[in-house]
Each structure stands twice: as C-alpha cells, then as structure tokens.
C-alpha cells in the first residue's frame, strides 16, 4: 500500500457551549441514556466554558508531528478526524479522497487494546471508508504503543516533576498511584484475541504502570481506575481513584503522586476527575496531592508518532519495553483477529 498521508484519529469533543449536548447525543446514540444523565455530564463541560481541551491538544500534537516529519525529510500531509465531533472522520476521509490520497497511516490517540481502546477505531475506519465509497483511501492503523520507550520516558519525567511539587517534608513517603479509564469487567474480559486469554487492556495498563514506576525508582505503586459510567449493577474495573484515596488515608498515607497513565492528553476526564474530584478528596483527607502531566504535550510524543510511521515507511524496528503483547495494526478496519475485543452492550463513556 502506498503511504501518502497520516490521519490522526481521536474521540472528539465540543469546542463551544452550544456543541455540548449535540456532542453528548452523538457519544450516547442508541444506548438509551436518560436526558437527565446527559445534562449532568454537560455540566462538567460547562464548568470549563463548554470547551473540551481534546481538539486543541490534538491539533498541537499534529503540529509537532508535522515538525518532526519535516526534520526527517518525510513529505506527508497530516489529517485530523474524530469519532464523535467535528472534524468527523467520515468528512476527513472524504477530504483525503478529494485530495487524491490513495493510502494512509492512521494514528489513534489511544495506546491500548480492548474495544474502546482499539477495535472501535477499526470500526471508525471501516465506517468512514464505507461512507466515502470506492474512492476512499486504504487506511492502515498503527499498532498499540502502550510500552513505547518514548511514552514511558515522558510519563517518568512527569512523575518526577509532580513529586517535586509535593511539600518537601512529605516527598520521601509519597505513594505513587496510576489511573486509567475504567471499563466494564466483561469488556476487559473480551479484550484481545480470544486465544490470548482476555483482559488485554488491564494487563497492558498494569505493564505500562510497572515500567513507569521502575523508571522513576518507586519500589511499589498502585493501579486504580477512574471515569466509570453506567448502571451501578454493571461491574467495572475497580477500585475507583476517589475510593482508593480514602483507603490510603485510612492507612496513614499523607501524600500521593497520581499519574494518569491511561491517557495521552489532559482532556476532560483528566482535568475533571483528577484535578477536581480526586484533588478535592485529597484535600478533604489532609493529603498532599500532585498530578503528573500527560505526554501529549511532551516533545517526545510526536517523535513517537513518527517512529510508528517509520516502521511502515522504511522498516524501522519496533521499540517495545513491555512484557504484554501488543496488536492493533490492520488495514481498512479489519479486526486484529476473529473475535478480537468483541463489543459488549456498553453504557455511555464519560466525556472527553
């Protein structure tokens, strides 16, 4: 397949107050989510002026990738498309076809396996190509990158910087806590090729957390979850970050560094669930709290994207640190394997 462009594919988010409810309706379409619940989530966006930071952050990543490509002498345009808000991926793939692109690589803003972390991006690709028709370019999704050295290095430096923001007299006893987006237990059980035993998502997150902790010299750490949604009777990955802070306080912990290892950028789930809810809970408990930044704004992140591209462009050897397998690289929306990351009946995800 000829590679003539890169498509950055993401979740999407509102960029003005009047976008909030239509965006949430797109996210939850067909799931029977009550209007009252949508209005509740909308308040999270309106707290920040009705603007999700995710689109601006993705445009910054694209600018960084364009600089890296230019420095490497790689002459390829970079396109931007979203699943749930403008620019919609269907419109972007149509634009690529009009521009004469016949083949492109796709970088998803999720490093993980699982339905929402990987297979749903394959579905986005398949849907967009079907909407465009025979003129649609062939699209190759790049592999999962949860254990790429540049990602781990960026997180490790962010953890060190967060530790320095804690009061000096508490740093030596600070607890390192990693967070990632919770998913239903059944969805995690179905994550990965069936022959791989399931739970690929939580295994990869645990692997990345282990690598980051080792890189920063922490002998021990915790992995917890955040941003769950849906009916309380549906089991999701636990414990929740807020509940875990209460547990730590009960054990005498008075300082934490929280690293959102499951997130590429400081989008709404990070700045609401961690910088508001978790931070407020820590203050209530008398606990010093510092949140590590996400890697999307780190200059190493666009270098990571270009390295993944070069694995296809010039045969660059993949760089990996983890023990868990990684998948995700297929063409035109094909799943990684039969039955891989089979979709569950899902409640609405939290906002971005």
UniProtKB/Swiss-Prot annotation:
Q: Where in the cell is it found?
A: Cytoplasm
Pathway it acts in? Answer: Porphyrin-containing compound metabolism; protoheme biosynthesis
The keyword Cytoplasm belongs to this UniProt entry's keyword annotation: yes
| One GO CC term on file | cytoplasm
Extract the SUPFAM superfamilies matched here.
Answer: Chelatase
Primary location class: cytoplasm
Q: Which keywords, in A-to-Z order, does the entry hold?
A: Cytoplasm, Heme biosynthesis, Iron, Lyase, Metal-binding, Porphyrin biosynthesis
| Binding site residues for Fe(2+) | 181, 269
List, alphabetically, the CDD domains matched: Ferrochelatase_C (cd00419), Ferrochelatase_N (cd03411)
Enzyme Commission no: 4.99.1.9
Q: Which Pfam families match?
A: Ferrochelatase
PROSITE patterns according to UniProt: FERROCHELATASE (PS00534)
GO MF terms, alphabetically ordered: ferrochelatase activity; metal ion binding
Q: Which InterPro entries match?
A: Ferrochelatase, Ferrochelatase_AS, Ferrochelatase_C, Ferrochelatase_N
> Which processes are annotated in GO (biological process)?
heme biosynthetic process
Query: Which reactions appear under catalytic activity for this entry?
Result: Fe-coproporphyrin III + 2 H(+) = coproporphyrin III + Fe(2+)
Q: Where does Fe-coproporphyrin III bind?
A: 52, 121
Family as reported in the entry's similarity comment: Belongs to the ferrochelatase family.
Name the job this protein performs: Involved in coproporphyrin-dependent heme b biosynthesis. Catalyzes the insertion of ferrous iron into coproporphyrin III to form Fe-coproporphyrin III.
What name does the UniProt record give this protein? Coproporphyrin III ferrochelatase
Q: Which organism is it from?
A: Nocardia farcinica (strain IFM 10152)
Record lineage: Bacteria, Bacillati, Actinomycetota, Actinomycetes, Mycobacteriales
């Amino acid at each position: 397949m000829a590679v003539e462009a890169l498509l950055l594919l993401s979740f999407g988010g509102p960029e003005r107050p009047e976008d909030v409810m239509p965006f949430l309706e797109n996210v939850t379409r067909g799931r029977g989510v009550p209007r009252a619940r949508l209005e509740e989530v909308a308040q999270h966006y309106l707290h920040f002026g009705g603007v999700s930071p995710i689109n601006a952050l993705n445009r910054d990543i694209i600018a960084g990738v364009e600089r890296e490509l230019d420095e490497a002498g790689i002459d390829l345009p970079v396109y931007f498309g979203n699943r749930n808000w403008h620019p919609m991926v269907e419109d972007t793939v149509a634009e690529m076809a009009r521009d004469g692109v016949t083949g492109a690589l796709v970088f998803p803003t999720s490093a993980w396996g699982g339905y929402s972390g990987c297979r749903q991006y394959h579905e986005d690709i398949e849907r967009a190509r079907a909407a465009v028709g025979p003129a649609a370019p062939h699209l190759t999704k790049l592999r999962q990158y949860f254990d790429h050295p540049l990602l781990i290095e960026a997180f490790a430096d962010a953890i060190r910087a967060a530790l320095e923001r804690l009061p000096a007299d508490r740093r030596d006893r600070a607890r390192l806590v990693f967070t990632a987006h919770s998913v239903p237990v059944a969805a995690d059980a179905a994550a990965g090729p069936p022959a791989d035993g399931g739970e690929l998502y939580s295994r990869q997150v645990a692997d990345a957390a282990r690598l980051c902790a080792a890189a920063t010299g922490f002998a021990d750490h915790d992995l917890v979850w955040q941003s769950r949604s849906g009916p309380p009777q549906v089991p999701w990955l636990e414990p929740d970050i807020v509940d875990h802070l209460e547990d730590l306080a009960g054990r005498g912990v008075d300082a934490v560094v929280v690293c959102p290892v499951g997130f590429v950028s400081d989008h709404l789930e990070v700045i609401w669930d961690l910088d508001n809810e978790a931070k407020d809970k820590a203050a209530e408990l008398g606990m010093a709290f510092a949140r590590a930044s996400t890697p999307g704004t780190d200059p190493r992140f666009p270098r990571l994207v270009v390295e993944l591209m070069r694995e296809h462009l010039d045969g660059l050897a993949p760089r990996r640190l983890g023990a868990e397998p990684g998948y995700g690289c297929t063409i035109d929306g094909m799943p990684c394997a039969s039955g891989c990351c089979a979709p569950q009946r899902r409640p609405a995800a939290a906002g971005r």
